[in-house]
Amino acid sequence: MASFLVLAFSLAFVSQTTANYFYSSPPPPVKHYSPPPVYKSPPPPVKHYSPPPVYKSPPPPVKHYSPPPVYKSPPPPVKYYSPPPVYKSPPPPVYKSPPPPVKHYSPPPVYKSPPPPVKHYSPPPVYKSPPPPVKHYSPPPVYKSPPPPVKHYSPPPVYKSPPPPVKYYSPPPVYKSPPPPVKHYSPPPVYKSPPPPVKYYSPPPVYKSPPPPVKHYSPPPVYKSPPPPVKYYSPPPVYKSPPPPVHYSPPPVVYHSPPPPVHYSPPPVVYHSPPPPVHYSPPPVVYHSPPPPVHYSPPPVVYHSPPPPVHYSPPPVVYHSPPPPKKHYEYKSPPPPVHYSPPTVYHSPPPPVHHYSPPHQPYLYKSPPPPHY
């Protein structure tokens, strides 16, 4: 009833809206039927049979016999006799008077005048102009282009299929060799020599173009399939039951009574009376009177008059007239350089030689023969 009222109200509202605005209502949504999901119970778990574990008791421990320890008493200490120390008095000091000082005689100094200086004659220097430089003519270098590289013909590699594997007890896997690599042709490099530089009046360096690289022939790799695995026969394991445990009875315990203690009586203590002290009377002190002082009278002072001064007259000055002047050197300018430049000759490199190489043929892959069972 409620749904009918809702439907009637919606129809009236739609008719009013269509009458006023001429709008159409959207169609009702289409609900597709979907069947209810089917739930399946999981399968019951499969319980595998496992045999009960077998417990083995450990073997009994083996107790080894150890004899009782033997105790030994330590030996008595040994006391050594040490005699009493002997004290000696130090000897009396001996006093000596110091010897009188000795004064040495030193003669008066002698003064000497220095010798006059000696002046050596040195001639005037002579200047020479350097010679003009000599330049030699050197022809320009001739550059040659390197020869083109020579490429040798190499036949295409031949691949052989591997031999069929031999099967032992089980079909072995089939190994296929990889296809051969494809080598693309690359033209040989062309080396061009640089143009010669123009240098005036200097020997130009000689440039040599590097030789072309030599390409060595390397044969193509040969791929071999690995040999089939060899399965060796292994016999089934043999299980041996463990031997029955052997119970060794421990040996009877023998108790040895300890040896009776030995009481060593200490040796009797012998007391030695110390020797009577010896009193050494010190020797009588003998006082020696110091010797009487000796007064050395100094030698009489002798005054020597200094030697009369010697006046050396300087040598007479000798005036040498200067040498006559030399003729002035006239510097001659070098001749003007002759700039000779030969015409530059450029050699074009020779055309490259293209050797014939056969067209690339597709590799025909051969499948290995079927295995023999």
UniProtKB/Swiss-Prot annotation:
GO biological process, one term: plant-type cell wall organization
Gene Ontology MF, one: structural constituent of cell wall
Expression sites (tissue/organ): Predominantly expressed in the roots. Not detected in the leaves, nor in flowers or flower buds. Wounding reverses this pattern, turning on the gene in the leaves and repressing it in the roots.
Sequence segments annotated as region (Disordered): 349-373
Compartments where located: Secreted, Primary cell wall
Sequence repeats: 25-33, 34-40, 41-49, 50-56, 57-65, 66-72, 73-81, 82-88, 97-105, 106-112, 113-121, 122-128, 129-137, 138-144, 145-153, 154-160, 161-169, 170-176, 177-185, 186-192, 193-201, 202-208, 209-217, 218-224, 225-233, 234-240, 241-248, 249-256, 257-264, 265-272, 273-280, 281-288, 289-296, 297-304, 305-312, 313-320
Keyword Secreted in record: yes
Protein name: Extensin-1
